[in-house]
């Protein structure tokens, strides 16, 4: 994991998947040593109940394992979005997320994006139906921006940090196994 800065407050984006679960676990493990006073929040945008259920499991599991940290709130929101207003889900998520962040004066989000390791054949199969996603996957297989600042329409500026962008999915799974947190493998949605 990339070295994390010291934050007064940080919001971890929990998708209900293994990448964000591993990220929260890594953050908790590191903060137990270095940043015990940092207020830790989480947020989950969901379209299906199983996403929220998995994210809540992750939040509870990691919070119980590292109970001495300054845990705050796990926010959630229905991430339905109007395609005529937002061109893609990411933009809608920035707007939804920023509302909670402004209310709690949070300026930093940790996001669990990892490198993509799909084969060329797998990418070609997806290209016709998901051209925008495939072009993003191709870009992310080489370089992922590890820090990016956003200014949503409500003008609450914040920065997204991607501290595990140098990991692949298999590296994330190995990390979870090495730390005997196998419940995160069975209770997440990816």
Q: For each of these PLM feature ranges, what is it?
A:
Residues 1-190:
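Nucleotide-activated chemistry modules centered on ATP-dependent adenylation/adenylyltransferase
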């Amino acid at each position: 994991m990339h070295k994390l800065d010291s934050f007064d407050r940080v919001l971890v984006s929990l998708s209900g998947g293994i990448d964000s679960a591993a990220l929260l676990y890594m953050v908790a493990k590191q903060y137990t040593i270095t940043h015990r006073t940092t207020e830790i929040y989480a947020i989950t945008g969901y379209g299906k109940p199983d996403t929220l259920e998995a994210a809540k499991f992750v939040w509870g599991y990691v919070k119980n394992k590292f109970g001495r940290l300054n845990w705050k709130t796990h926010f959630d929101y229905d991430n339905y979005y109007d395609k005529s207003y937002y061109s893609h889900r990411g933009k809608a998520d920035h707007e939804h997320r920023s509302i909670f962040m402004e209310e709690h004066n949070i300026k930093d989000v940790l996001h669990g994006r990892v490198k993509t390791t799909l084969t060329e054949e797998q990418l070609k199969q997806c290209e016709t139906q998901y051209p925008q996603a495939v072009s993003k996957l191709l870009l992310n297989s080489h370089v992922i921006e590890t820090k990016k600042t956003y200014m949503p329409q409500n003008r609450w500026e914040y920065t997204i940090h991607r501290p595990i962008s140098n990991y692949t999915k298999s590296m994330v799974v190995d990390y979870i196994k090495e730390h005997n947190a196998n419940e995160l493998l069975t209770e997440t949605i990816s």
